[in-house]
C-alpha cells in the first residue's frame, strides 16, 4: 500500500508543493530562483496542448454519424456557459457587497503607483468584442499552432473535422492517422506529467519566496472572501448542478484530484487541459463532446475568473471610496459578461481582463489595480481550481443533455476509481 502511495502523482505533487512552500518561506532568495522550474513545466504542457486539441476534436467530429449533433452540442454548451458564468458573476457581486472587504481602507487613487499596472492597462486597451472575435480567426494555420491559441486551433480543428466527415470513406485513412497520432501525443503527456512535482515545487517556491506569507496580511480579507466564495460556488452551485445531472460533486473532485494539485502548483488550469480531455472521455463522455466543450470552456466558462472579476472591481471601488450604486454595478455586470469571455485559462489573464473592465466602466480608477497586484498571484490558485472543476462539470452536463454520456461508466468510475485507466 505504501509504495503505491509514494509512487502516485497525487502524493508526489502534494509533497512537492509542501516542500516549495517551506523553501520559499525559510529561504526566500533561493525560493525565488526556482521560478524556471515552474515556467519550464508549464511550457512543456503548452507545447502539447494545440496538437492534442486538434486530434481530439477532429477525430471526435469526423467520427460522428450526424453533423447536426455537433451543432446541437455547441449550442447547448454555449447556453450553459453563459448561464453559469452569469451566476458566478452575480455571486461574486453579492458576496463582496455583503462582506465589503475594501471598506475602511480609504486609499487615495492619486497615491497609487499607476506605472506598476501600466503593462496590464496597455494590454487591456486591445480587449474588445470585435477584436476578440477577429482574433479567433488565425492569420495562418501554422501561426495558430505556433502561438498555441486554443480558440484558433479549435476553429481550424472543427472545420477540418467537418471536411473530413464529408469525405466519407475517402477520409478513412486520414481519420485513422489522426486518431493514431493522438495516442502518440497522450504518450508524450504521460512523460511530461512525471515532471509535475518538479514544476509544482518550483512555482510554489517562487511564489512564497518572492511575495512572502507576510504580504497576505494587509489584503488578506479579500483573499479569504474570494476563497470562501469559490468554495461555496463549487459546493453549492456546481454541486446542485451535478446532483441534477446524476453525480456527486465530491466524488468528481476526488476523481480529478491529481489535475487539481497540478493546477494548484502552477496556478493555471491550462496545465491540466490535456489530462482532462482524456479523463472526461474515460468518465463516459463521448470524444466529440469533450473535444468541443473543454477547449471552448477555457474562454467561455471560467467560473473562478468570473467571481474574481466582480469581487476585485467592487473591492477597488470600496478601497478608493469610489461610489457604486445599483446601476453602476449592473453596468459592471453587463460589461463583465462580455469582457470575461476574452480571458484564457492562463496565469495573469484575469488581471488583464480586470484592467479592460475598469477602463470600460470609466468611473473606477484603473490605478486601483495596484492595490491587488501583489496578491493577485495568491488568488490565481482559487481561480484556476474553480475554472477546472467548472469545465469538468460543464462537460458532463452537456454530454448528458445531448445524449452523449455513458451513465453506467460514469457511476463505475466515480464509485470505483481504482478502475481508472492508467494511461491517462
UniProtKB/Swiss-Prot annotation:
GO molecular function terms attached to this record: fumarate transmembrane transporter activity; malate:proton symporter activity; succinate transmembrane transporter activity
Cellular location(s): Cell inner membrane
InterPro entries: C4_dicarb_transport (IPR023954), Na-dicarboxylate_symporter (IPR001991), Na-dicarboxylate_symporter_CS (IPR018107), Na:dicarbo_symporter_sf (IPR036458)
Keyword Transmembrane part of the UniProt annotation: yes
Transmembrane segments: 4-24, 44-64, 76-96, 142-162, 184-206, 222-242, 326-346, 352-372
SUPFAM superfamilies on file: Proton glutamate symport protein
Alphabetized PROSITE patterns for the sequence: NA_DICARBOXYL_SYMP_1, NA_DICARBOXYL_SYMP_2
Pfam families: SDF (PF00375)
Bilayer topology annotation: Multi-pass membrane protein
Keywords, ordered alphabetically: Cell inner membrane, Cell membrane, Membrane, Symport, Transmembrane, Transmembrane helix, Transport
GO cellular-component term (any): plasma membrane
GO biological process terms held by the UniProt record: L-aspartate transmembrane transport
Family (UniProt): Belongs to the dicarboxylate/amino acid:cation symporter (DAACS) (TC 2.A.23) family.
Function in brief: Responsible for the transport of dicarboxylates such as succinate, fumarate, and malate from the periplasm across the membrane.
Name of the featured protein: C4-dicarboxylate transport protein
Organism: Erwinia tasmaniensis (strain DSM 17950 / CFBP 7177 / CIP 109463 / NCPPB 4357 / Et1/99)
Amino acid at each position: 500500500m505504501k509504495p503505491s502511495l509514494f509512487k502516485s502523482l497525487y502524493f508526489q505533487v502534494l509533497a512537492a508543493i509542501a516542500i516549495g512552500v517551506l523553501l520559499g518561506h525559510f529561504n526566500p532568495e533561493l525560493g525565488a530562483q526556482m521560478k524556471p522550474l515552474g515556467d519550464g513545466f508549464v511550457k512543456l504542457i503548452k507545447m502539447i496542448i494545440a496538437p492534442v486539441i486538434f486530434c481530439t476534436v477532429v477525430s471526435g467530429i469526423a467520427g460522428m454519424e450526424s453533423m447536426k449533433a455537433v451543432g446541437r452540442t455547441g449550442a447547448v454548451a454555449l447556453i450553459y456557459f453563459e448561464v453559469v458564468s452569469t451566476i458566478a458573476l452575480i455571486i461574486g457581486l453579492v458576496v463582496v457587497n455583503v462582506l465589503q472587504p475594501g471598506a475602511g481602507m480609504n486609499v487615495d487613487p492619486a497615491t497609487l503607483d499607476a506605472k506598476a499596472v501600466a503593462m496590464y492597462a496597455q494590454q487591456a486597451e486591445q480587449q474588445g468584442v470585435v477584436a476578440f472575435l477577429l482574433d479567433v480567426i488565425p492569420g495562418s494555420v501554422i501561426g495558430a499552432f505556433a502561438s498555441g491559441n486554443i480558440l484558433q486551433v479549435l476553429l481550424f480543428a472543427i472545420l477540418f473535422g467537418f471536411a473530413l466527415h464529408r469525405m466519407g470513406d475517402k477520409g478513412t485513412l486520414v481519420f485513422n492517422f489522426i486518431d493514431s497520432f493522438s495516442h502518440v501525443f497522450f504518450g508524450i503527456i504521460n512523460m511530461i506529467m512525471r515532471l509535475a512535482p518538479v514544476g509544482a515545487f518550483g512555482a510554489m517556491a517562487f511564489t512564497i519566496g518572492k511575495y512572502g506569507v507576510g504580504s497576505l496580511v494587509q489584503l488578506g480579507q479579500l483573499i479569504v472572501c474570494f476563497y470562501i466564495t469559490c468554495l461555496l460556488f463549487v459546493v453549492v452551485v456546481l454541486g446542485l448542478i451535478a446532483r441534477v445531472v446524476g453525480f456527486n460533486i465530491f466524488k468528481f473532485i476526488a476523481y480529478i484530484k491529481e489535475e487539481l494539485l497540478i493546477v494548484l502548483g502552477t496556478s493555471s488550469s491550462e496545465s491540466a487541459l490535456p489530462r482532462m480531455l482524456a479523463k472526461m472521455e474515460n468518465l463516459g463522455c463521448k470524444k466529440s463532446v469533450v473535444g468541443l466543450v473543454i477547449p471552448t470552456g477555457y474562454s467561455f466558462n471560467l467560473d473562478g475568473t468570473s467571481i474574481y472579476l466582480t469581487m476585485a472591481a467592487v473591492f477597488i471601488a470600496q478601497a478608493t471610496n469610489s461610489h457604486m450604486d445599483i446601476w453602476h454595478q449592473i453596468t459592471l455586470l453587463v460589461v463583465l459578461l462580455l469582457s470575461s469571455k476574452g480571458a484564457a485559462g492562463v496565469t495573469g489573464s484575469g488581471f488583464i481582463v480586470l484592467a479592460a473592465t475598469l477602463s470600460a466602466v470609466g468611473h473606477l480608477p484603473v490605478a486601483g489595480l495596484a492595490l491587488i497586484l501583489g496578491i493577485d498571484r495568491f488568488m490565481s490558485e482559487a481561480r484556476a481550481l474553480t475554472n477546472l472543476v467548472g469545465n469538468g462539470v460543464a462537460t458532463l452536463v452537456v454530454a448528458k443533455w445531448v445524449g452523449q454520456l455513458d451513465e453506467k461508466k460514469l457511476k463505475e468510475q466515480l464509485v470505483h476509481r481504482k478502475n481508472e485507466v492508467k494511461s491517462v
